[in-house]
Amino acid sequence: MQLNFKKSGTGPPLVILHGLFGSLDNWFSIAKELVDHYTLYLVDQRNHGDSPHSNEWNYGVMVEDLRELLDAEGLDSVFLMGHSMGGKTVMNFAVQYPERVRKLIVGDIAPRYYPIHHQVILEGLNALDLSQLQSRKEADDLLAPYIPELGIRQFLLKSLGRDANGFAWKINLPVITQHIEEVGKALDEGTVFEGPTLFLGGANSSYIQENDLLDMKRHFPNCTWISIPNAGHWLHAEQPQAVVTEMRRFLG
């Protein structure tokens, strides 16, 4: 699948993948701080942003999407970063194609299995009747009973597009809803990436715990875990400067 991406900057290639319900736009503020040091590739994963929709949606096909992008751009090896779902994609890519990853950064996700925990968000998104929707404000009001956190609603509504025909989701909501269990799947047992790896966690997030370290080291023996103070799961939005600082320090 030919993914949508935005390329900018000069220097060694750095490819960044967003998380579930997100898009490459989520990384613009980080990208501004990095364009003088790296050739950046901000990527929309399948069924997200402006990339194509598909009924097939799992880490196996998302890894191959990424490989196809690197092949098309003539990139033999890259710095690779992914957040949340994107973190799972880049971990799977690194253990499958280790020779193509110079250094790996994983944003607030561990290699383990995560139980489904987006049911209420999906319930709210699926409850919106886009054919009757008059405004983004109305969409926000209708989502509020399901998702009380304004910041999360604003993040989700970035994926609500509008054209002459009305509102439409950029995400492939039916497929994501049907296959949501794919997002939480663990890395396969015995898979290893021995290259330099940085796990960046949010200090206020529960996605990476102390007891994940053993599993992280088993798959990524050359890994470091850094916890960003005053950051939750969306650490790049909450503490962008701290994230940039740690990325620069690690990548060089």
Segments (PLM) and residue ranges:
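Gly/Ala-rich beta-loop-alpha elbow adjacent to hydrolase catalytic centers
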Residues: 82, 86, 90
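Conserved serine/cysteine hydrolase catalytic core
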Residues: 165-219, 227
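Alpha/beta-hydrolase fold catalytic core
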Residues: 1-15, 35-38, 75-76, 178-181, ...
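Conserved alpha/beta-hydrolase catalytic His-Asp/Glu region
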Residues: 116, 131-187
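Conserved acidic catalytic loop of the alpha/beta-hydrolase fold
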Residues: 61-78
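Flexible "cap/lid" loop of the alpha/beta hydrolase fold
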Residues: 92-96, 102-133
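Catalytic active-site module of serine/aspartate enzymes centered on a nucleophile-bearing elbow/loop
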Residues: 223-252
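Conserved HGGG/HGGXW glycine-rich cap/lid loop of the alpha/beta-hydrolase fold
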Residues: 4-52
